[in-house]
Amino acid sequence: MTSHTLTSFGRQISSPVIVALDYDNQDTALAFADKIDPQDCRLKVGKEMFTLHGPQFVKLLHQRGFEVFLDLKFHDIPNTTARAVAAAAEMGVWMVNVHASGGTRMMTAAKEALLPYGHDAPLLIAVTVLTSMEQSDLQGIGIDMTPAQQAERLAKLTQACGLDGVVCSAHEAQQLKKVCGQHFQLVTPGIRPTGSDVGDQRRIMTPEQAVLAGVDYMVIGRPITRAADPAAALRQINQSIAGVINAR
């Protein structure tokens, strides 16, 4: 697991937690952001909030000192995807993603679009299999593989295209680290502290289990954003993760 990264704001963020800002209201999302420390996590902006509020919302988070994962899962023809990824880089986001199922030409074009940004380029990762999907869902779209098999196949393709890592289930993390190496970044949604509502996720793990599986970054939403004390909930998760790391 990545122990820390130096942020564009000159600080170190030791936490692997990315908090999903799954709101439908900008004021509510910013009120949440104002309750937590940018050194304790990063923030994920997804399709709903970005469609509602656009780049200005990302700018407001940057002004508060947060690094942003722009989770728009681009999946289009190579040129369109490349231009979208470059636009994300222009916004100064920390991480952006595409769908690995877009294929080699699309992912390669996206990676090449970031070359002019050098060390300032965001991390570029690809989505393998959505954590809401089970084998029956894959069969329904003509893929005769288990989620783990499909995730491994797409992770290898992603790495061959030069991307930084993948979004995957924590259940696939150990195998993907084995086949893609320790430096290949794994970002996992479907992380729920013990006792949390699993929502619409199907393949989930606790933060502690995710660390032991080799996850680099974990996306956690409602257990933090809907907590009575979000800052305390985030601190508790970070402490539990640190305890596992220190015990290794």
From Swiss-Prot:
Keywords: Decarboxylase, Lyase, Pyrimidine biosynthesis
Active site annotation, chain numbering: 73
Gene Ontology annotations for the cellular component aspect, listed alphabetically: cytosol
Positions annotated to bind substrate: 22, 44, 71-80, 131, 192, 201, 221-222
Organism encoding this protein: Photorhabdus laumondii subsp. laumondii (strain DSM 15139 / CIP 105565 / TT01)
Protein name from the UniProt record: Orotidine 5'-phosphate decarboxylase
The keyword Protein biosynthesis is annotated on this UniProt entry: no
Record-level GO BP terms: 'de novo' pyrimidine nucleobase biosynthetic process; 'de novo' UMP biosynthetic process
SMART domains: OMPdecase
Claim: Lyase is one of the keywords in the record: yes
